[in-house]
Amino acid sequence: MGCVSSKSTTVLSPQTSFNEASRTSFRALPGPSQRQLEVYDQCLIGAARWPDDSSKSNTPENRAYCQSMYNSIRSAGDEISRGGITSFEELWGRATEWRLSKLQRGEPLYSAFASERTSDTDAVTPLVKPYKSVLARVVDHEDAHDEIMQDNLFGDLNVKVYRQTAYLHGNVIPLNTFRVATDTEYLRDRVAHLRTELGAKALKQHLQRYNPDRIDHTNASYLPIIKDHLNDLYRQAISSDLSQAELISLIARTHWWAASAMPDQRGSAAKAEFAARAIASAHGIELPPFRNGNVSDIEAMLSGEEEFVEKYRSLLDSDCF
């Protein structure tokens, strides 16, 4: 793997469409490095390397999935380097195409992996396996604070709350909200009581949406402004005039915004990582896997933008830079 650069050349296009016209002044990037990651590392690209027994990163199925992602990232990186992908929206489309290729058309969740979130739907992730390791991080987070959460089945619960926010064009953008119950003994007893009173199925349905331990994701009404910002970041990131430090900062910012926004119903974490890595690949950089214990979208959501940018290199399983 390497941090490779080469002299750029100008790519001219005779087409007159908006996208093609924007390529007229595009200066080609080095494209994917000839020196690829070791196969072992290729098979960890995109893996959710949870710090506990939830990690499935070494299963044959996961290794095949990750190597497929790696190869498709390099293909997208080559396309970017030649001016073939002119917006983040197009790059997200390539990531979505790859993700759908790992599913069978007609599978129950196929459409969710292909669909954007809308403002009339809730996006909630209960912090159960494989997310159990997140609980302690929320409780110990320096920006988390104590609140009382009201629930019609659990009553008033003491919870730790971390609210992720962003700043865009001088405005505060609320992103993800993490909640973790601290009344663990009461909660355990209450769940056992409700399972008997309501039945396991009814309780499961309630917990799927209103689990006291959960992430309430970025409201979809903010997605248009975030997507515009991602397009701006992408245009900056495909410049041939960037220093390596500037490039890595833009890649990290792109990854942070895409992962934190969670634009699609399913698969946004993988697509965000795909996009970040494809931009790096276009510049001749082979980003290594994330270190064991670092799940990139969770790291993004538990961080502010500047914090994530500052620690991005340290999250990767290499001292390449």
Curated annotation (Swiss-Prot):
Which InterPro entries does this chain map to?
Avirulence_B/C (IPR008798), Avirulence_B/C_sf (IPR036231), AvrB/C-like (IPR053495)
Where does the UniProt annotation locate this protein?
Secreted
**Cellular component GO terms held in the UniProt record:** extracellular region
Which Pfam families does the entry mention?
Answer: AvrB_AvrC (PF05394)
Query: What Gene3D superfamilies is this protein classified in?
Result: 1.10.3290.20
- Record keyword Secreted present: yes
UniProt keywords (A-Z) are: Secreted, Virulence
Give the family, as the similarity comment puts it.
Answer: To avirulence C protein of the same strain.
The protein's name is Avirulence protein B
Source organism of the structure: Pseudomonas savastanoi pv. glycinea
Q: Lineage of the source organism?
A: Bacteria, Pseudomonadati, Pseudomonadota, Gammaproteobacteria, Pseudomonadales
